[in-house]
């Protein structure tokens, strides 16, 4: 189990109930190379190996080019990675819990580094918006897949 840095200058978390089982939700988020097909915030992704701890993936989200490394891959309950962009060190964790025939999806992220410290308010708002966005897109795609299964 991986934790974000709760003492980082910028942190955000969110949760959302999804009408799909944890395996379906996990399949959506762990299919990293397919992120651009369901998350309009992700422009491109290149995964450099299988989806397992230690695998690097490079991706573009908004104005940022990111390099991330998978740290935890525990289907269907948790996936987490660390990443860097523009001097920001990020930790992003997704956890899934079965809930009333669906899934409670929780996402947490922390940012460290000079930019995150200097622009705390901006960093926190950006993170919060990103967490809300990815959970909403994840819900839409997982429920779409569950409906066609």
List where the protein language model places each region:
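Hydrophobic ligand-binding cavity/cleft-lining segments
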Residues: 1-49, 143, 149
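Short, conserved beta-turn/loop elements at beta-strand boundaries and strand-helix junctions
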Residues: 74-77
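A short hydrophobic beta-strand element
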Residues: 53-55, 79, 103-108
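Beta-strand/loop substructures that line and gate deep hydrophobic ligand-binding cavities in soluble
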Residues: 84-140, 149
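Hydrophobic/aromatic beta-strand elements that line small-molecule binding cavities or substrate pockets
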Residues: 14-16, 66-72, 83, 91-98
């Amino acid at each position: 189990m991986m934790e974000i840095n709760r003492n980082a200058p910028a942190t955000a978390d969110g949760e959302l109930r999804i009408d799909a089982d944890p395996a379906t939700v996990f399949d959506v988020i762990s299919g990293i190379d397919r992120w651009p097909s369901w998350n309009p915030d992700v422009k491109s992704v290149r995964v450099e190996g299988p989806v397992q701890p230690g695998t690097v993936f490079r991706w573009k989200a908004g104005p940022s080019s990111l390099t991330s490394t998978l740290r935890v891959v525990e289907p269907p309950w948790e996936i987490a990675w660390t990443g860097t962009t523009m001097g920001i060190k990020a930790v992003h964790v997704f956890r899934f819990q079965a809930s009333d025939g669906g899934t409670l999806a929780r996402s947490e992220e922390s940012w460290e580094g000079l930019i995150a410290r200097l622009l705390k308010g901006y960093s926190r708002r950006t993170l919060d918006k990103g967490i809300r966005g990815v959970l909403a897109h994840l819900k839409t795609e997982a429920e779409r897949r569950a409906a066609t299964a």
